[in-house]
């Protein structure tokens, strides 16, 4: 009996020791877990502080980059601007390519006109100086001078004669087509030869107005308005165009 009791006591002591050992091991694990948690939190805080300091020392420029969509709005805007500018440059270069030849052709044409007038002034006497002192416009060998001031038909005719020229006389289809570009409005010579009859029939509208016998005498002068011939009162004042021809 005494030996049995001793064995029981030994067993109880061993169990107590095992329980105490397990308890102390569990407490150590808890302490270690808490220590690890504290260490992890500390490391996170340290990283945050380091990142904050780095951001303050090296501020990043805003680029407008959208991480969610993976696109850069600024880049898209610049691409659109680049396309617009490129298209505008192409259009501008194309226009310049068309304009430069026209400018050169106009300059050459004007140079030929001036050389014709210069040669005319040098070869002739002082009576041709009036032709050289005005800005005449040339179509082939025909030169024209447009006046916006108004005169009667007789005054217009006399003014052109003073410039050693004559009142506008349209005698060909080519001449008419050139003059229609300028939308001439004023007194003209109105001949009844075959050429003028053909022009009036095919290319020019004649404004017909009924006059009595007394009015016909005063309305025997004609003027051109756009592409229309009209009979007008010779005493009324209108614009006019002078013309001369180099044969």
UniProtKB/Swiss-Prot annotation:
One Pfam short name: Lectin_C
Extracellular topological domain: 101-247
Gene Ontology molecular function, alphabetical: carbohydrate binding; transmembrane signaling receptor activity
Bilayer disposition of the protein: Single-pass type II membrane protein
Keyword Disulfide bond: yes
Transmembrane segments: 80-100
The name this protein goes by in its record: Killer cell lectin-like receptor subfamily I member 2
Domain C-type lectin: from-to ranges: 139-243
Superkingdom field: Eukaryota
Any one of the GO BP annotations: positive regulation of natural killer cell mediated cytotoxicity
